[in-house]
């Protein structure tokens, strides 16, 4: 299933997102009842903007998240049912934005827009960005250089640069397990940089190198490519800003 979703990586995922939301925008603009496809679109739109659609979207999403949390089935997020749920929720939120982002007089409802657009951006970044997410592991001994790493299913993948482990050190606790460790690495023979636990090195936009583990033989690095995470962060900040304004000034605008 993982290989299937990678087919939709950039730029195809971005194109599909534009087509999906563009299609719903067309349905919104053609919402007056008419003949043929316009009548079908109008009826579909009425349902998607109904309380039943909103409640069902929230209930299904919460139920899916509870299932993942209690079952530990992380593979469920890559299944067609979960993808359909997220797409359904995004569509409902998008249509709510189209309907309510302005007052009848034309003034923008900034608190409403920040909250709903932030939610849509956070959900959308996680959804449409999944095909571009790559996680790899790379074991290196001191002084060793590699331009390839291993995906989580064991395939060899090119990094696009040379990673060299210049030096590493670790401190152990009383039972002999590492309590702190760090490594110095260089990328394409550039100046060495230090990587510690939970403090990765950002080698490119949306690509970070983490220090996963160390041993006497060397270090294991985790390379994570997640370019859409910044859009998710912007969405979360928008959501928080809207919630803060709502708390300070109330729901009036």
PLM regions: where:
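Solvent-exposed, non-transmembrane regions of integral membrane proteins
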Residues: 1-253
